[in-house]
Amino acid sequence: MRLRVVAVGRPRLAYARLGVEEYARRMRRYAPLDLVFVRKGEELLPKAEGHRKVVLDERGRLLTTEELYRRLLAWEGERVAFLVGGAEGHPEAVREEADLLLSLSPLTLQHELALLVLMEQLYRVLTLRAGHPYHRP
């Protein structure tokens, strides 16, 4: 599985930037990862061309870690892009192209925090796939 995370704007909050960098470093031990930052929401889709598209959206489906793991296993061998919008969310065109609209929480999360939570969950899924004991159900 080849993962790409495309986010609007680089994290400016120190804790988010450091956390995203740390989880990206850890994830690359288990799978190829591209971490791409764009300036505007309209730039997300071109960066996800040829990928399954998982769009983070507060109106999306809430999945457990195990459900996300199973969904990604079903896409094994494919390229999967996770699209994280900016402070204004996603343009409608991005939501319409989604293979999966995913909500990380019923709470509204600041976009940098949402990116950090996504990175941790992707790391968790990859360690689960590898049989590493990081995830404890």
UniProtKB/Swiss-Prot annotation:
GO terms for cellular component: cytoplasm. Gene3D superfamilies: 3.40.1280.10. GO terms for molecular function: rRNA (pseudouridine-N3-)-methyltransferase activity. It comes from the Bacteria. S-adenosyl-L-methionine binds at L56, G85, L104, S105, P106, L107, T108, L109. It catalyses: pseudouridine(1915) in 23S rRNA + S-adenosyl-L-methionine = N(3)-methylpseudouridine(1915) in 23S rRNA + S-adenosyl-L-homocysteine + H(+). It is found in: Cytoplasm. It is an enzyme of class 2 (transferase). The keyword rRNA processing applies. Keywords: Cytoplasm, Methyltransferase, rRNA processing, S-adenosyl-L-methionine, Transferase. Its EC number is 2.1.1.177. Its main location: cytoplasm. Signal peptide: none annotated. InterPro entries: Alpha/beta_knot_MTases, RlmH-like, tRNA_m1G_MTases_N. Specifically methylates the pseudouridine at position 1915 (m3Psi1915) in 23S rRNA. Belongs to the RNA methyltransferase RlmH family. Homodimer. This is Ribosomal RNA large subunit methyltransferase H. It comes from Thermus thermophilus (strain ATCC 27634 / DSM 579 / HB8).
